[in-house]
Amino acid sequence: MSPENLSDCNNSVKDFDQHPELTIRQCVHREKPYKQEECDDSACDQHLRVHKGGMPYECKDCGKAFKYRSVLYQHRIIHTAARPYKCKECGKAFKRSRNLAQHQVTHKREKPHKCEECGRAFSALSVLTQHRITHTGEKPFKCKECGRAFKYNSTLTQHEVIHTEAKPYRCQECGKAFKRSHTLSQHQVIHKGEKPHKCDECGRAFSKHSSLTQHQVIHTGEKPYQCRECGKAFRYQSTLTRHHIVHTGAKPYKCPECDKAFNNSSTLSRHQIIHTGEKPYKCQECGRAFYCSSFLIQHMKIHFEEMPYRCRECGKPFRLSSQLIRHQRIHTGEEPYICRECGKTFKYQSNLTRHQILHTGAKPYKCPECGKAFNNSSTLTRHQIIHTGEKPYKCQECSKAFYCSSYLIQHMKIHFEEIPYRCKECGKPFKCSSQLIRHQRIHSGEKPYICKECGKAFNCTSYLTKHQRIHTGEKPYVCQECGKAFNCSSYLSKHQRIHIGDRLYKCKECGKAYYFSSQLNRHQRIHTGEKPYVCQECGKAFNCSSYLTKHQRIHIVEKPYVCKECSKAFSCSSYLTKHQRIHAGDRLYKCTECGKAYCFSSQLNRHQRIHTRERPYRCKECGKAFITSSCLKRHQETHTLQTPNSV
């Protein structure tokens, strides 16, 4: 059909629009007229689609075609500046009534559309539909030029401009050209210095709406991008993509100097500075140089950024109100993030996320050398250095080397960062006031954190949290090897070395080896006879601080640890733990020589000396050696006892 005929057809429809009283309509392309008892637009619309392939109504401005005239009328508003639909709450105007309806939900805070996967709610169905794609990973929109797939049609449309050379949108200020008008608009904000997109939560302003959207996730705590391997969730798609490399084990970025490989380019770049000693990031204000851009950014805040939010407790200033709120939890002890499994509370979302892995038992990070698995990547990285002995992170100031980048960063603060907070009692310096406040409690004896069950006080919230587990019986830290549970993560870490068999710390006197340096230090006092911990009440001395703590309860007759089985009370939690094994009948520690089993490791250690003939406790008077310290003490009394004949 020729364009002229189509034009005639359109004119015939137009004529009928102006004369609705007509009941018979005739198309110039049909031999017979068609009759309609009630003259309405739908018959004309239906008929006209025969000629135009289903899309008879074309926009004169952009050429886009539509099925219905009503949709064309709605579309034409895009080309005009008219925004007839105005919000009564905030005055914001919209081109379409449905956009106004969607916007008004934000004032009512209604979110009727809920995601079945993660439970997140949305104010608009279209936003929920877009969100669902984050769970499925579906990318239905494919570029015909390069085959790249996208989640959203709008993203594909933006991408397709890459394949054309045209950049019709040029900046009048600097001459830079852009492929899209909105990219030019975003760019022009740089010249104006405008930041029109403001966060309602903290007042921070941004030049781009996308930057504001990214920022707002900080306040909501939302993490919509979840890893299918380990369940870990992320705020941004890019962070999830980087995380996936952890599971594949791919390390495509290799250092040409030492052949060390990395799973991302930024880590390689930071590593290479170790070899060059270069500090490319220089402060324009004071000339100070840094080897890492993040250090420079942190430093620049001293010169430029306002810090309007100040803590009333310690005076520490912050750039954002959200940072101040997080900081204030140190003083208030508030822990708003609750674990649904065990009820444990946390100050920060990140701490809760790490904790929840304990309940799932997931250990997705496996060492390729020995097969040991870990529940987070940083622990695996630290573990792998045991095999290599490598200390790749070297301080450029004093040449001290570290096997972990976080230790180097912490160390670098000694050289570069100011430490303005100093203890008046002992002179120890601190980087932030909260650390100084905690430290000063050692001198003052202040213990502001009190247990509601037994009244015991602590100078630190973490100590109170550990203590409270004695009353609740909670043991959230479970050994994956033998199923033994602990109420403290450090106890689990110590226990796990039993399975690994690593006894790195050896006594030079008797050859006995230990898992920890602290254990070796305590043991060596047996040989030296040193007892630095003295009771102020009776003057009795001990070679270990925990023994002194236990002893001091004799004077105050405090027994806060009660057995739930028989109500027997103990002055020390370890005594209660040992006692409870009597009820449980657990004999976990078995002798490999004769098969005899014991409730406690100390009993097994004493027993094994029968087989090894080891006698580590030696009398300084006569040189006689004994299997246990109690035997040595009894023997030493023979030297101190004086008979009447010897006087």
Curated annotation (Swiss-Prot):
Which InterPro entries does the UniProt entry name for this protein?
A: Znf_C2H2-type (IPR050758), Znf_C2H2_sf (IPR036236), Znf_C2H2_type (IPR013087)
Location in the cell reads: Nucleus
Against SMART domains, the record matches this protein to: ZnF_C2H2
> Molecular function (GO) terms listed?
DNA binding; zinc ion binding
Sorted alphabetically, the keyword list is: DNA-binding, Metal-binding, Nucleus, Repeat, Zinc, Zinc-finger
Q: Check the record and name the Pfam families matching this protein.
A: zf-C2H2, zf-H2C2_2
The organism sits in which domain of life? Eukaryota
Location (main, coarse): nucleus
Q: Where are the zinc fingers (C2H2-type)?
A: 57-79, 85-107, 113-135, 141-163, 169-191, 197-219, 225-247, 253-275, 281-303, 309-331, 337-359, 365-387, 393-415, 421-443, 449-471, 477-499, 505-527, 533-555, 561-583, 589-611, 617-639
- Would the keyword Zinc turn up in this protein's UniProt record? yes
Where are the bilayer-spanning segments? none
- Give the UniProt entry's GO cellular component terms: nucleus
Its recorded name reads Zinc finger protein 11
Q: Gene symbol?
A: Zfp11
